[in-house]
Amino acid sequence: MTDGLERLCRKLGYRFAEPALLRHAITHRSATKENNERLEFLGDSILNFLIADFLYSGFPRAQEGELSRLRATLVKGETLAELARELEIGDHLILGLGELKSGGYRRTSILADAFEAVIGAVYLDGGLEACRKLVSSLYRDRLETLTNEALLNLKDPKTRLQEYLQARQFPLPDYRVSAVSGEAHDQVFQVECTLNNTFPSVIGIGRSRRKAEQDAATRALALLLAENEDMNV
């Protein structure tokens, strides 16, 4: 194993049984036909699975849409490129001459792809548990930060609105079904959320009373936050 690959292994905290896999993972398509694109494809799928698994365990109250948004934040190209920079993957990339001259080793897309390829290489070399351990280590700080920031956002809109009002000693909101339309099996509910005499009532719409109330609460909270921003200008 070359000195460069040794340094990268130390950064990763993982030693390859087959160093050729790591070399393959850092070889860009501009350098040779035998490049990291297939490993990138594999690593992308494994990374998405592992992050989904971490989030599923860490956010037991989160709904599917919320989990998807959290995962998207953790696997987007900018995040992967940041991780690649922390590992100094760019220093070891094997690039074609043109890509090297144009600074490809700094390019977000190339770094993100190489990071995914490294994940794929670790999977082929050491299996899923080796990958899980590596991803857990690399993402530890981000997962902890995300957990702290996301706990409030994972609360349902009615809870967030109630807590916002209580913190300011405002009256609690009142929800009233103002209209129901559609057939019995396909009804649409309209709910009116009344805050107090200072703010106008807000209308929410949903396929159930609960969803309409949540929609109304979301709109009411947005109104309150916008009003608060205007007062602070």
UniProtKB/Swiss-Prot annotation:
Q: What class of enzyme is it?
A: hydrolase
Superkingdom as given in the UniProt entry:
Bacteria
Cofactors, names only: Mg(2+)
Against SUPFAM superfamilies, the record matches this protein to: dsRNA-binding domain-like, RNase III domain-like
In the Enzyme Commission scheme, what number(s) does this protein have? 3.1.26.3
**What keywords were assigned to this record?**
Cytoplasm, Endonuclease, Hydrolase, Magnesium, Metal-binding, mRNA processing, Nuclease, RNA-binding, rRNA processing, rRNA-binding, tRNA processing
Q: Where is the DRBM domain?
A: 156-226
Give GO BP annotations, semicolon-separated.
mRNA processing; regulation of gene expression; rRNA processing; tRNA processing
Q: Where in the cell is it found?
A: Cytoplasm
**PROSITE patterns, per the entry:** DS_RBD, RNASE_3_1, RNASE_3_2
Pfam families associated with the record: dsrm (PF00035), Ribonucleas_3_3 (PF14622)
A single GO molecular function term of this UniProt record? metal ion binding
Q: Which residues form the RNase III domain?
A: 5-127
The cross-references to Gene3D superfamilies, in alphabetical order and at most eight, read: 3.30.160.20, Ribonuclease III domain
Q: Name one GO cellular component term.
A: cytoplasm
Which reaction equation describes what this protein catalyses?
Endonucleolytic cleavage to 5'-phosphomonoester
Annotated Mg(2+) binding lies at E40, D113, E116
Q: What does this protein do?
A: Digests double-stranded RNA. Involved in the processing of primary rRNA transcript to yield the immediate precursors to the large and small rRNAs (23S and 16S). Processes some mRNAs, and tRNAs when they are encoded in the rRNA operon. Processes pre-crRNA and tracrRNA of type II CRISPR loci if present in the organism.
**Binding partners and assembly:** Homodimer.
Family, according to the entry, reads as follows: Belongs to the ribonuclease III family.
What is the recorded name of this protein?
Answer: Ribonuclease 3
What organism is recorded for this protein?
Nitrosococcus oceani (strain ATCC 19707 / BCRC 17464 / JCM 30415 / NCIMB 11848 / C-107)
Q: What is the gene called?
A: rnc
